[in-house]
Amino acid sequence: MMSERIFLASPHMGGSERRYVDLAFDTNWIAPLGANVTGFEQDLQQYLGAGYVTALSAGTAALHLAVRLAGVQRGDRVFCQSLTFSASANPIVYEGGEPVFLDSEPDTWNLDPETVEAAIARFGVPKALIAVHLYGMPGKLDAIRSLCDAHGILLIEDAAEALGSVYHGQKCGTFGHYGVLSFNGNKIITTSGGGALVCRDEADAQHALKMATQAREPVAWYEHTELGYNYRMSNICAGIGRGQMEVLEQRVGQKRAIHDRYRDALAGLPLQLPAEPEDVRSNRWLTAALLAPDCGVTPGQIIAALAEHNIEARHIWKPMHLQPVFRDCAFVKTAERSVAEDVFARGVCLPSDTKMTPEQQAQVCAVIRGLF
């Protein structure tokens, strides 16, 4: 008999979500407006401690609006971290921009500041730069922001995987001109599907809200002076989010405990888990391991072995510059071998579901140990 499925990451309800969802039904506010949407935005804004929050239908919608607000137009270059999910880069192309993909640094696997400098020297100042906090680990934000400030580059902070992560005492999602959050079903909290845009300036937040509601002008008839989108979050989904916010810090603690158990149980094996830099708290959304070169075991073998036990694991994100859809885009690296390519070749994402018990995690570790 097949054992109970152990997921990579799945929705984990806290218990109070239904109360907020029932509120939407009781008041008949089922549309993408209402008390839950407003309340969820306020909860997020209070938690982040900075910025103006607009709840949206997806993290991708938030990224698209950020690219719009940055003024990206056809032919504009936008620098983007290559080691990420495709949603980080797709909105650049939505607006006719040209992605220039940048390599990672080996410490956090995030955007390499030296590569940013090399890209500026090669291509000039971009219209914007998209930096990602991979698997919840904050990137080298001080260096990246310093470069952006020095060259007048708009920073879009893709914190889709990093809600609850903290860099030098400041919450991730609040460092850029625009910050992006995701509440997809696999994220640290979920609204089923959803995202949020964090704007530094209130005027930008108001403009984002306008674009997210079809860019309708405030007149008696339907009038539009710019393109808009149907990107607003449902009041029902926002109700789930309000309940999830009540357990966010608990989920961060659980994710970090999962990472620590992997660190202890897999000690001595030829693999490495990324360490937190000083004065950084990762939410450890997914624990990812980097296998030693020539260790005799591949990520694919680990994934296949775990799958035999009904356990889900996955490869690291395939870098964007290796994706067929972006084959004509430039890629910049400073190391002889691309860090992003190396991490993709040797990395594996381990089950990090907050509903996974310590006993189930011990089973995961036993399967992995059995391969070495």
Residue ranges and their predicted role:
Residues 1-31, 351:
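N-terminal "arm"/small-domain region of PLP-dependent enzymes with the aminotransferase-like
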Residues 33-77, 91-94, 101-103, 170:
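Phosphate-binding glycine-rich loop
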Residues 35-42, 47-53, 114, 118, ...:
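PLP-dependent aminotransferase class I/II
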Residues 78-79, 92, 99, 155, ...:
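A short hydrophobic/small-residue beta-strand
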Residues 84-89:
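Conserved coil-to-alpha-helix start sites within the AMP-binding
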Residues 95, 150-151, 309:
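Helix C-cap/helix->beta junction micro-motif
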Residues 98-108, 314:
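Short beta-strand->loop structural element characteristic of the AMP-binding/adenylate-forming
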Residues 107-191, 196-198, 203, 298:
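Active-site phosphate-binding strand-loop segment of PLP-dependent enzymes
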